[in-house]
Every structure is written in structure tokens, then in C-alpha cells.
Amino acid sequence: MAVLIGLLFWFCAAARHGLLQSNAYDLGLFDQWAWLIGQGQPPISSMEQVHVLADHGAWMLYAAGAAYSVMPSVQWLLSSQAFTLSFTALPIWWLAQQAGLTPRRCWLMCGLWWLQPVVFNTNLFDFHPETWVMPLFALALWAERAERPRVWLLLLLLLLGSRDGLVLIVGGMAIDLAWRRRWRWSATAAGLSITWLLMLSRWLYPLLRNGEGPKAAGRMFSHLSGGPLQAIQSLDWGGGLLYIVLLCLPCIGLWRKRSLPTLMIGAPLLLVNLLSASPSYRTLIHHYSLPLAVVMVVAVIDARPQQIRAIRGFSWTLGWAVVCWLALAKPWYFSGPYLSRVSALNDAQEAISQVQDTDAVLTTSYLVPQISQRSRVAFPKKGSLRNLDNSGWNVLLLNPNDPGWGSTKRLQKNLLSEVQQRGWLCENWPSKLELCRKK
């Protein structure tokens, strides 16, 4: 079943990418980094001018670089993400077995995972390396309960190697362990998360960012820099409450008092999402809440003592999960929003065929992932690019009628007018896509 669902996830993600709905952030970004690693070049993004390790400390991306050295393809990222999300059900099954649930109830726990809206939506939303370690996160919970300290510690190290933000999950595990009076385990998890955070913020990030610390922290929490009253007023109370309700909706009816320690694992990450200045942290569309889905399903497992023979309302439980998935997941995007560029597919393919591997290309955000396996590629961000003086770009592939995320019609029109005045060779298509090459 996990294989079939993994194939379905991969098909959906690949279809979205093929329909020109993926973006520079983040599929194009990670695709370029993986390609640069595979080519033996410095993995510094031409879009962000940032080393791969200075982004989120995700050293596990070097594994993708090894795959790219054999055969460079964005499908490495999409397929690995799809299958790791699907196969997270395996350690969830083991956790359910460990708790004494019957095989039928173990299947129900797997179904609850597969039907988490944030799981499906994360699979669709480009690529993010923390998806690789969701099986390891669930397995780490199993290893702790099975008294496997070495396995547990190794899994935590791998967890941290996919994204710096997962220090919040490891810190949450320390809280859970302290609640259960497992003091040595708690101290180990807390020490590991604090050490990793300090190593990144005080050494690695400044080393690779010319003395600067983590880029996301300033953006996420700058609104909290005033007094307490100002900070309270700046919080998104309504959006935060709705986010919590929608996030918990598939599982909340299955939690019991016994679930509370497990739910504490997600508390630090949930708090950061609520405090963030960006509303995207408080949606089920993005990947920021993905680890919380693991926590919520494991909390359902922990709600049931081993002596319980059956979970009441098996069909109702599964049916409710399906209803929540249909309401909050985004499969229906394939019947509408994801079809918005179908008429431009042939034009885009023809234009891309004229782009050479060595070209430095400035294009729309949704075309970046189609051509990101090169040393220089980016999209014209609004407010950051006024002209092409000393920019080094030799190809523009833009569509002012559909400028894509982060750009504007006016900016792209101005850039095209500028290169036409400079005598670049330009070709356009019926969809208003225009390719200009420097002579």
C-alpha cells in the first residue's frame, strides 16, 4: 500500500511540475543546489547568493547531489519526497504495534497519516528536504520507547541534518521526555538541540554568510521587537485560532488525556508558527506544519491503552479523516488552478528548447524549475532588479501577461523593452512568452 500511495504522490507532484505550477522557491532552489553539488561546483544559489548549508543547515542535500552526479533530474527530489512521506506509515505501524493495537487498528493509524491534509499538500508544494526525515522522526519515537538509545540518537542527528527548524521538534521531544521523568533522555535531546542551534547560528551561518546569522529569524520575529503590548497586538489571533482548529480537525476527537505528553512534542514548533510574521506558517498548504502531523497521529496511538480491544467507530474514524482530507487537501486544484497554464505548455517547451546549458537565464518563477540545472538562473523579483547593467544575464525568458510569483507585469515589460533597445535578438509566442538573447 505504501508503494502505491508513494507512486500516487509522485505522479501528482510530477504532474503539477509538468503543468508549470512549481516555483523557483523552493523546487528551483533545491534543484539547482543538488545539480551544483553533483557537478562538483560550489553549491551557491544564483537566486539567493547563499551556500546550501547556510540556508537551513541541510547537509542531507549532499545525498541528492550524489544522485544528480549519476543522472541529474528534478524527479529525484519529487520521487524521494513522495515515497518518504508515504513510507512514514511504516514506523507509525510499528508504533501502533508497540502500543498493542491490532493489525486492523494499525492500518487505521497508517490511514490517518496518509489522509492528513498537510501531508498531501506538502507533497504537492515543490520540494523540502525535511520530508525525507519524517519516517526517521516516527522511528525515533519508536526507538525511544523500545529503549534503543544509540539508534534514537543517530536518528535525531539525521533529523537535524534536514532542516534547522527541526531543533524545535527535538526540543519538544525533550519536553515530552521530561514530563515522563526520563531525565537522561530528556537532557540528551535538549542538549543536542541547543548545541545544534548554537553551532549553526554562532559558527556555520556567520562563516558562510559573511558574519550574518540565520536569515529567517529576523523576518519571522521582527514584529515582536517592540514592547509586550505591541507584540500582543501584532499577533494574528484570528488566523492562529483557525490554523489550530484546521490542523487538529482530523485527529482531535481521538485524543485522550494519555495523548498530552506526545502532543507536547509539537508545542515549540506550533508556538513558532503562531508567532511568525508570515501567514504561510499558519496554513496547511505549506510544509511548516508537517512534523506536527506525525505528532498528532502518534498522539492518537498513545490515547489507547494496550488493554483496549478495539477503537470504537472504525468506519466513522476513517470516514471523518476522508472528509477532512477532501475539505483541506488540494486535489481539486488539478481541476482548476493547476490548469491555468495548459495553453502555454507548447510555447514554454519550444522556448526552453532554445536555451543552452551554459546560458545565464532570467525567467519567470514558474519556469525556473524547468531550467534550474545550470550555474546561473533567477527570476526578476519586484523591488530588487531595475535594469540589467552588469548583471551577467545573457538570456531573458519572460511573460509579462503571466509574470509569476514575486514579479510584476511592469517589471518584466521594462526588462524586455531594455534588452530590445540594446539590440538583443527576441522571439515571442502566442501566449506572450518572449525569449531574448544577447548578441
PLM regions: where:
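Short acidic/glycine- and proline-prone juxtamembrane loop motifs at membrane-interface regions
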Residues: 122-130
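Short helix- or helix-capping micro-motifs
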Residues: 106-117, 156, 160
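Signature aromatic-anchored transmembrane alpha helix within multi-pass, membrane-resident enzymes
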Residues: 2-3, 104, 190-194, 305-330
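Transmembrane-helix motifs of polytopic, lipid-linked glycan transferases
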Residues: 75-100, 120, 139
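Hydrophobic/aromatic-rich transmembrane helices and adjacent perimembrane loops
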Residues: 263-308
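Membrane-lumen/periplasm interface segments of specific transmembrane helices
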Residues: 12, 22, 26, 183-268, ...
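Extracytosolic helix-loop segments that constitute the early lumenal/periplasmic catalytic or substrate-binding loops
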Residues: 11, 29-52, 59-60, 144
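Membrane-interface transmembrane helices that cradle and orient dolichyl/undecaprenyl
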Residues: 98-100, 129-132, 137-151, 178
